[in-house]
Amino acid sequence: MEKGGAASLQPGSNSDDDAAAQQQQQDIPMYFVSVNKVPTQVICFGDQCSGLVATDDAKPVVLVIPGNPGSIEFYTEFMREIYEGLKGKVIVWGVSHAGHVAPPKPMQIPNVEDHPTLYSCEGQIGHKLSFIKQYIPSGAPLILVGHSIGCHMVLEILKRAPELNVRKAFLLFPAIQSLDACPRVSIINPLVTYLRPLTVATLSALRLLPRGVQNLLIRLYIFLATACTTPHRSSLRGAVNYFRPECLMACFVFTRDIIQNVRERDNETIARHADKLTVYYGQNDHWSPVEYYDDMRRTFPEADVRLCERGFRHAFVLDRGVDVGSMVRGWIETLLR
């Protein structure tokens, strides 16, 4: 789909959604577009667009880049809070990672085994750059919001596309260094490598269960992994994608790649763009511990580096998306004055 066209725009519910789930999604401006030949789920809050191409190149575009797994549906309430809180002063868009969300029929995700480079970390960075160049006017003020591994992608966008009019970049709970040293890697790594066929087969079989049972299993997993007891329904909808083998495979390729390759923090890019960055670390973050915050403060004493004092978890989108969205909305409001 070229800039200005809308031929590939598709409604956002996936092929397995039942009537109740579709009803819940009616108020979410969700679509699928083709980016690098991969059907990609996007959410677009804002009336200044024509088929997802910005028509007002003076209005700032807030672009949200997710963590992993990368369904942008996890971020629905976070994005809505930013958009509604700023009363239409900005456009708020979010783009899923390539292959992480099942598109509606007849669209299909390119086979992961035949096209692994589409779903690697490098492929996902290229996917975000292509989305920006395809749908956002080159002169439009751009505010980047990355979460977790999405922060790594934000830094890569700043490095690789200096022509973009990036006004600000917010890095939330950044996973930008030493991912192989994180404590959960010892559990995750086998699941995405030699146990991958068994993991994919087992989780894919669960899609045959009724949606209510799937949601119960998702809630149980979320509780065991994060201690969250009240995940928002948008989190449940986003998680259902990972009962699909093609989405699991894309997610696993990406996970393995970032564990292997996201090691050294890109101090050069951070230094070059320090005036544009706000970096927000968590108090109890297994992907980015407080020691990384301390080191960032020592290395960049003049940068805007903050430590969470409100008890937000790394996976804040599960149940605190509105609260974190309100915080980010306040930061953006200050920027717009």
Predicted regions and their residues:
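Flexible "cap/lid" loop of the alpha/beta hydrolase fold
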Residues: K159-A201
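Short, surface-exposed "cap/lid" segments of acyl-processing enzymes
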Residues: N36-I109
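Gly/Ala-rich beta-loop-alpha elbow adjacent to hydrolase catalytic centers
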Residues: V145-G150, V154
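Short alpha-helix in the alpha/beta-hydrolase fold that links the catalytic acid
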Residues: E77-F78, D266-N267, D275, P289-R298
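Acidic catalytic loop of the alpha/beta-hydrolase fold
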Residues: N261, Q283-S288, H314-A315
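Short beta-strand/loop motif that positions the catalytic acidic residue
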Residues: H273, V279-Y281, D285
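Active-site loop/oxyanion-hole signature of alpha/beta-hydrolase fold enzymes
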Residues: H97-I143
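Catalytic active-site module of serine/aspartate enzymes centered on a nucleophile-bearing elbow/loop
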Residues: D275, P301-R337
